[in-house]
Amino acid sequence: MKVVIDGAGEIGSHLTKLLVREGNDVTVIDSEKSRLDNLSSAADIEPIEGDPTSIKALGDAQAGKADLFIAVVPYVD
């Protein structure tokens, strides 16, 4: 299954590792390269560096072709 995860923080990273272990094809979008680097070293993912809310990053990740899209970005009040 093709999964796109929007956000590589604590929750996004945990979900990514679980989904990769289950054999899913996971793409992760995050604006912080260091988060993507850390996650890439722990799991076989396709990292996309960019604003998780931008149309460009979502297009680069082919979010429209994903079987599952998960957004785990922080809540800002």
Give the residues covered by each predicted segment.
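Cytosolic regulatory regions of ion transport systems
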Residues: 1-77
